[in-house]
Amino acid sequence: MKLPNSHNLLIASLLGLLTLFAGSYPLVKAQSEPKPGCQATVDKILQEIRSKGVRRVEFSVSKGTANSYRTGNPTTRTDVLDVVLIDDVGATTSNGIAISNIFASPKLLNNWANQIVKNCGNTAIVSFWISQSDISRNYYIQQDGTTIKEKCSQLDNTSEPIPWGLGLPVSCG
């Protein structure tokens, strides 16, 4: 059954108006990509470390320990995230050399620390460690949400608490 001409005209007019108006309104952009979560950020960094030749790397979070023996944290964050590069085959192997190269790049470590504190809402300190050694690089959150590398203090081991961002000569590098 064929619709009368007035109905065809009405439908065609409505379709024309819809087409006209659809083109005149800007499309609403979907919201930007959500910030990657803490776990996704850490996983990405661990994968990047592996891609640089490190065979094994692990991480752990020490909840609520950032202010232990320290004073002056400019934030309310309290967690320490440790990234451990495992050197179980020796410093002269390709794995050991890859670890040494990473630790020789404070800008790279600082970049990773900044990514972690940006996406891990309660992380105040990011520590990079070489397993089976005393070698670590520690990055402390600042008021602006970025991190700075730990500075070596001249304080002795009995000085408690240690000012934020300072480390004892034994542990800082």
Regions from the PLM with identified roles:
Residues 50-96, 120-173:
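Polar/charged, Gly/Pro-rich intrinsically disordered segments
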Residues 10, 31-38, 98, 102-105:
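Intrinsic-disorder-associated interaction segments
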Residues 97-122:
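Short, non-transmembrane amphipathic alpha-helical segments
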Residues 12-22:
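Bacterial N-terminal signal peptides
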Residues 29-33, 115, 147, 167:
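Disulfide-bonded cysteine motifs in exported proteins
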Residues 25-67:
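N-terminal leader/targeting segments
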Residues 2-14:
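Bacterial N-terminal signal peptides that target proteins for export
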